[in-house]
Amino acid sequence: MIEVFHAPQPPLPNHITVGAFFDRFGDQKWPILADTNPSVQALIKDASVRAYINLDDPQVLTGLQMVQSAGHDIDPPAIINAPIQPEERP
């Protein structure tokens, strides 16, 4: 009898769509998107030109911390570490 072993599948990358990224801000999404603070606008503009958001990129945490420092009640680690849902994937 021949046994066949399959190599384990590599884990999926921690990538989500730009829309899913903004949706993770919850009820803070619209105030953040409307904010004219230069730090907040920097995150919005940077995210908006991307095909997807790589949640493993340390710059994502830095950007979220800038948004938080601008006065928005968000939890950067929760936004980054929440399990990725199938509909959030690019």
Placement of each model-derived feature along the sequence:
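A preference for well-ordered globular domain cores
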Residues: 1-90
